Amino acid sequence: MFRRILEIFKKGESEELDSQEKFLVGKVRVEGKLRVGPWDAVICEVEEGIVKIGYKLKKGRKKVPIMKIQKERKDIEFAIPGDKVALILDGSIEVESGEVLKIYST
């Protein structure tokens, strides 16, 4: 299990980004969006890479930090390909079902 996670981390692609963003570490396919208290939650399935708390979800030029990740209503530290999760965001982003969004490390 840990070996697979390390392989996923090593696959991160380097792209020209601002000083806050360094690596593309994953992609998620959006299934929906909810409001959880004062925050937005994006329901999605991880397609590639790894998603961790503190990483940023990016659509176009807008990037929003991931504040919390939940799987089956339990908080988790990270998600890997195949996981269906809710990404609780520290901000708002407009998404549509079926969209593929990128995840960047900081």
Protein language model regions, located:
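Beta-strand/loop-dominated core regions that host nucleotide or nucleotide-derived cofactor-binding catalytic loops
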Residues: F2-I50, K56-T106
